[in-house]
């Protein structure tokens, strides 16, 4: 969400940004929102003029009332009363005009704010330009991709060897897109989550368990309407939504708040279940636990000074790389192009893990800088040392999403005999186990 003043003063820049995001259908919205802003400001100015006129008339009535009270001449009294009545009629007409102007202002402002939610955030100048994720750019690789000399089964087949997953039972209970994890696979899932939590605590982040349901105004504050419709489950009859990621409730924690500047940055890491509709057709490689309606995730968010957000963005995606490399999983950083950025994002990158089975990388983390978009929507402000208020920047990144992390772990640590090596970093969370041995 952009500042209306910025749009008013830089309409061509805003339109160029829309073109860079390949959203040309939104170009007319810039002129529409400027026209609505003009209508709104015109109503405000007219209202101020009417208010001044009303005050002038009301002030004029004071002396007239005084003279009327002291006057003995009937003709003069009648004349004074007539002036007072005329002034009162003018004040009444003024009030009626004020009411109409307030309605005009409110309607223009509501329509303007609705359009402001649709106009995308200005992207960072470093973002590569392209229409979709096929134009995302590989930046750097970390770790040597593995090419085993034995076939690697699909991840659910590996899990089934340990009696670790039951997709059929979950389908009977909940439908497609759900799973039961059991035994060592379930323990591995919990180990990954706990390791991610402790990893971020060691980086200085505060551990947080947030609400798993949030109000609609928080949802609208953290994501676009398009993303909201595609992702969020609404609780019927309640102003509550199940979170799609704990970023939503962690950022929402600061709604309508004024933070002292010396309390920045706010750095939180949280665990939560996540619930997503995941609309649309999914490819054959997105079966199993890859793309599901319910999963668990460790997340990180930062609320910081605007001048610090680029440095935090760099730190945050590197935390992801460090975590995956500590588990001996090769990864790469992929810079998201303009057309692949969600409307609230200034800049974003994916961290992708190596799949020995597919001999290619797949997404496991997403790191984003949202500039002041969420802060503006949620009315999160900071009071600087000079006493002035400003909007902070917000960032988020996946620490670890165990379903996809499990895929990467199992494939990269599978042995020819069917066993799976437990990375040293996870062994304390697995009761000291160094290897998982298949049951059949």
Positions of predicted regions on the chain:
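TRNA-recognition modules of translation machinery and tRNA-sensing kinases, especially anticodon-binding
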Residues: 27, 141-440
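N-terminal alpha-helical targeting/anchoring segments
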Residues: 1-145, 160, 164
